[in-house]
């Protein structure tokens, strides 16, 4: 699920317009960490390729992309709880659970830095609505991935 979601948004981390707006955008990318984790688990070859939501060559609606990145960044806060459970299974921030690791400066500061930058982006009322719609689309995508991968409906 994480691989599919982060594949969906990976192209955003190379977008120069987003890079101008958000601090350390490339450093916030987690897809390669997920790939390393899958290799640690011996399941890298089992991952199916799915066409990502965002591609490098497609036109980008900046507010929509900001909504998707908001969800990705927010998920890193919850990853602290998942990391604790992963450690109980024998994984760590250096093997099997890299993508769950917090930022060197700490999860809270990492999130606040992102949010401070997001709050400074000049957006019209309509743009703000597209940010929210982008975040909602990212949450729906995550739920669809969970339902598909785990084969059962998860309450919304």
Question: Language-model segments: which ranges?
Answer:
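Metal- and O2-centered redox machinery and metal/ROS homeostasis
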Residues: 1-156
């Amino acid at each position: 699920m994480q691989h599919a979601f982060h594949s969906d948004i990976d192209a955003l981390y190379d977008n120069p317009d987003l890079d101008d707006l958000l601090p350390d955008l490339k450093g916030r990318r987690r897809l390669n960490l997920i790939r390393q984790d899958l290799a640690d688990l011996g399941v890298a070859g089992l991952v199916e390729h799915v066409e990502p939501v965002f591609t490098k060559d497609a036109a980008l609606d900046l507010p929509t992309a900001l909504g998707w990145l908001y969800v990705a960044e927010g998920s890193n806060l919850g990853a602290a709880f998942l990391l604790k459970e992963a450690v109980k299974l024998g994984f760590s921030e250096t093997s099997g659970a890299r993508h769950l690791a917090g930022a060197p400066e700490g999860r809270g500061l990492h999130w606040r830095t992102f949010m401070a930058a997001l709050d400074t982006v000049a957006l019209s009322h309509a743009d703000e609505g597209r940010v929210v719609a982008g975040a909602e689309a990212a949450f729906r995508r995550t739920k669809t991935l969970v339902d598909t991968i785990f084969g059962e409906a998860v309450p919304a």
